[in-house]
């Protein structure tokens, strides 16, 4: 019964409404510069996007 109602309510705002564009994760989303990627995917793709690591 309860599983039928799981995530049926529309997510228009809040952390549940935003997903990673690569993996679909809801946690750790980087929205700055309109990246919309989770931090894990960003670490793997940062060099390809054009971000440089200076340390």
Swiss-Prot record:
- Record's GO cellular component terms: cytosolic small ribosomal subunit; extracellular matrix
Question: Binding residues for Zn(2+), per the UniProt record?
Answer: 20, 23, 38, 41
Q: Which GO terms describe its molecular function?
A: structural constituent of ribosome; zinc ion binding
UniProt keyword list? Metal-binding, Ribonucleoprotein, Ribosomal protein, Zinc
Task: Give one GO biological process term.
Answer: cytoplasmic translation
Q: Where are the transmembrane segments?
A: none
> Looking at the Swiss-Prot or TrEMBL record, what is one Pfam family this protein matches?
Ribosomal_S14
What cofactors does the UniProt entry give for this protein?
Zn(2+)
Cofactor annotation remark: Binds 1 zinc ion per subunit.
InterPro entries referenced in this protein's UniProt entry, alphabetically? Ribosomal_uS14 (IPR001209), Ribosomal_uS14_CS (IPR018271), RIbosomal_uS14_euk_arc (IPR039744), Ribosomal_uS14_sf (IPR043140)
Identify its protein family.
Answer: Belongs to the universal ribosomal protein uS14 family.
Write the protein's name.
Answer: Small ribosomal subunit protein uS14
């Amino acid at each position: 019964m309860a599983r039928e109602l799981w995530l049926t309510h529309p997510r228009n705002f809040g952390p549940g409404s935003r997903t990673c564009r690569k993996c679909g994760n809801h946690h750790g989303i980087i929205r700055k510069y309109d990246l919309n990627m989770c931090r894990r995917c960003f670490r793997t793709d940062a060099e390809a996007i054009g971000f440089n690591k200076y340390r």
